[in-house]
Each structure stands twice: as C-alpha cells, then as structure tokens.
Amino acid sequence: MTINIKKTFETVDDGIANMIDAANADYENFNVSDEMKARFKEEWVIKNGSKYTKIMTNNGGTAWGFVVNVDDDKKFKKGTLLKCAGWSAPERNGSRGNVLEGGFPINWTGPLYLVGKGSI
C-alpha cells in the first residue's frame, strides 16, 4: 500500500520525520510480525551531509533515499527527495517528491515514481 504525503513543512528535518512516519505507517500494513514492525520503526538512521541528507534503514545498513538539503543545487530545490543510485549517492535523474511541499506518494521500500518532467 502507498501513503500519500500531503503536509507541508518549513524545515527539511520536519519533512523527513513526516515521511518516515508515513513509511512506518505503510509498513504496518505489511504482513509481518509485531516484533518486525517495531524493529523497522527503531532502525532508521539519518545522516546529514554537505549537500544531501541520507536516509537509511536497518541501523544504517540499507540506503533508502536522499533529500537535497541546500538552496543552491543546480537541478533540484531544497527538500527534493531522490532515490538511491547506490549506497553513497542519489540518482539525479528526477525528483521523487519534495519533503517541504508534500504531494507525493511513498511506501516503506523507498521513494516511488518520478515526479514532474520525465515522470511516468
């Protein structure tokens, strides 16, 4: 099941917290034990870098997504959600949403479809 992010936020940190809450709510609908649901909620790791905030699950063992945390990115606005290209870098082919503006779908597995130009 997919959760639609609707709220808007002033800070990237608040937007990320809201998105993680939505991913946790989506995981609640997954057919796993209560123990696994509790562990999933506890194992998020957020790492702020100079250009991106990296979001990880499994106590930092799995890269989940990236959020642009600067105002001067040449392609994306601050708060833009990007999927992972790999462990340490985002895929910069298109936005998956914006944690400050809302209006995008998310599920527990990570950022979904492209939003805007080039979207599906």
Q: Which residue stretches match the model-derived regions?
A:
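Generic marker of "main functional regions" within proteins
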Residues: 26-33, 91-92, 97, 118
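Hydrophobic transmembrane signal anchors and adjacent membrane-proximal interface regions, especially
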Residues: 3-7, 77, 82, 112
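Negatively charged, low-complexity tracts enriched in Asp/Glu with abundant Ser/Thr
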Residues: 2-48
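Amphipathic, interaction-prone secondary-structure segments
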Residues: 35-77, 82
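A short, surface-exposed interaction/processing loop segment used at functional sites
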Residues: 77-107
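C-terminal partner/receptor-binding element of secreted or periplasmic proteins
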Residues: 102-120
